[in-house]
Amino acid sequence: MSIGRSWRRPISTLASALLLALAIAGPARAGYQATAESNESGFEPPCVDFSDSLPAKMLKAAASAYTRLGYATGTYTMSSFTRAHTLMRTVSDWGYYVHTHGDYYWHPGDQRRYSGFREDAGKCTQAVIYSKDIAAKRAGRPTNLVVISTCHNAEANTTLPAAFGIPKMKSTVDKLGPRFYLGYLGNAFDSDEWVFEQRFWDALASLHSVGEAFDIANLGSFGHADFAADWWGSYTWYGFSGPFVPACSRCL
C-alpha cells in the first residue's frame, strides 16, 4: 500500500534537504559502517534442488547502493555470513541489508516466536539470527537504512524494526530522523524481490527520497500477484549515512 502523497513536502524544502544531503554524502562520511549479507548456500544444491544466481546479484547491487549513499560497506556471503559475525558487526552498523530465508521463528529457550532470518555459514543447517539477538547488541541505537530481503519480515507482527531502533511508524525525517526499514510480506520470491530492489536502488540513485523510491519500486508488474512490500520510517529522507543535521535551526 502506497501512501506517498500524504508525506510529500514543498519542493523548496525538499531541495534544501537534498542539497544538504549531497553536501555531506560520499567519502567524507566513510566512517558510517554498513553490512550487506546474502545467503547463497541456502539457494544452491545440495541445500535445494535448484541453482539460483539471484542472491549474488542482489548482494552486489545492495553493496553498490549503500556505498553510493556514503556508507563504508562490507559484503559477506557463504562462510563469512554467520550469526556470530552479523551480531559482531551490528553493534557499529548504520546500514544493513540481508537477503536470506526469514520467518517468525520459534525460540526454544524463551518458548515464544521472534522475527528473524537465517545465516549462510556455507552449509545447509543454518542458524537463526533472532530479532532479540540484534536488539541486545544494538541496545536501542537507531539504524539509518535497513533492507530485510526475506519472507515475512514486514508483516504486522514483525519484531525486527524495533531491534534496529526503527519505530513502526510512517512519518517525515524531521519527526523520526534518518531511518527507514523495508521488508516483504508473506512468501516472497527472490525473483520479485530482485525486480523491486533494482527499482528501489535506481530511484535512490536518481535522488528520490526513500519513500518515493519505495513507491517507484512498487510500480509495474511482478511475477507473483501476491507479492507485497512495506516500510516504516521517514518517507522524506534520502538514505544518506549518518545522523540528521539540519542546515539551520529553522529549516524544518
Question: Across the structure, where does each feature detected by a protein language model lie?
Answer:
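Bacterial N-terminal signal peptides that target proteins for export
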Residues: 3-15
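Bacterial N-terminal signal peptides
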Residues: 14-23
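C-terminal region of N-terminal signal peptides and the immediate post-cleavage residues
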Residues: 22-31
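A domain-level signal for caspase-like cysteine endopeptidase catalytic cores
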Residues: 30-121, 148
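Sec/Tat-exported extracytoplasmic proteins
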Residues: 66, 70, 97-100, 138, ...
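Loop/turn elements at helix/coil->beta-strand transitions in domains of secreted/extracellular proteins
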Residues: 69, 91-95, 141-145, 175-180
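Caspase-like (clan CD) cysteine peptidase catalytic core
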Residues: 120-150
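Active-site-proximal C-terminal subdomain of hydrolase catalytic domains
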Residues: 145, 150-252
